[in-house]
Structures are given as structure tokens and as C-alpha cells.
Amino acid sequence: MNATTSLAALAFAVLLAGQAAAQSETTTLPNGMDITPDYQEYGRWYNAEGIPTYKFDDEGAIDFATFNGYRRYSAECHVCHGPDGEGSTYAPALKESVLRMDYYDFQQVVASGKQEVNTAQNQVMPAFGTNKNVWCYIDDIYAYLLARGTDDLPRGRPAKKGPKSDEFREQEDSCMSM
């Protein structure tokens, strides 16, 4: 095999490896939470403590709920928090916030809003607890932000997604019809 063929084969192997994304080796966040997927319920993945997380399949597709979190984040959150959880000049990077904050604190802030006023800043986040497009998908949004925060999921629309399960669809219909 000549050098050109070897280089082409190496480049092809690297390309294939990049297409099949995988869970990162880091499973414990700075806040101490283990993000290893343990079980699935209503089409969503959770860790052993019942906290939403994400999972890639063997072909590198992200689970549907996390993909849905991308969609809901893009529709409801990115206006203030920037695309892909990266933050903006007036709102924090949520992909970093979820690595440090407790899931239940995240829920509380999303549901009730938050205001931080001091000499350096005046940050106000409105409450989204009554917005079904956010609250029915809070676990999905959280899982998406975790995947972004750990850099397991690159910027932009996820390239591959798992199927939407009947269980997910039923739970979604139930929540949206309340």
C-alpha cells in the first residue's frame, strides 16, 4: 500500500469514527451527578437517581427525547440564551449552568423564573412553568443541555436521532392536552 492509499484509508477511518458519536468517558459532572443512563421511561433516559440524561445508540444517534430537547430549546430558549446553549451578552450559557446546578434547581428556575440584581448586573428570567412547550419537555431540554455541556453533542441540529416511541408520543399527548 502506498502513502497516498494509507493516508486515504486513515482519513476514512477517522471520518467513520467521528460519525459514530458516543457517550463521553466523563460520567460525573462538577455538581457530583452521575449522568450514566440507567433506565428508560416514557421514551426518556434517566440516571440511577431518576434525573434525565441522554444516550447515544451504537450507530451514534442521540435518543429522540434529547433531539426533541434541541428542538424545544431552539424554539423557546435560544432567543435569550443563544443557540446551542452557548449563552449571550445578557443570559448565561445554560450548557455550562446544568453542569454545576442541581436538576431540581434547574426546574425551579425554569418554572418560577429568576432575578439577580447587583451592582454588576440585572438579570431577569421569566417563568415558563405554564408554557406547555417548555414544561412538557423540561426533561428533554435538560438532557439536551447536558449533552451540549459535556461536549458529547456538537453545535447545531443533531445529525442522527433515534425513533420517537409510542410511549413518548402518548406521554406528550397527555401533557399537551392538560
Give a label for each model feature:
Residues 56-57, 82-87:
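Short acidic/polar micro-motifs centered on Gly/Asp/Asn
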Residues 62-83, 111-112:
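Sequence/structural segment immediately N-terminal to covalent heme-attachment motifs in c-type
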Residues 70-78, 87, 100-107, 135, ...:
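Sequence context surrounding c-type heme c attachment/ligation sites in exported
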Residues 24-29, 88-95, 113-140, 145-165:
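Axial heme c-ligation environment in periplasmic c-type cytochrome domains
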Residues 2-5, 12-64, 144-160, 164-178:
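Post-cleavage N-terminal segment of exported redox proteins
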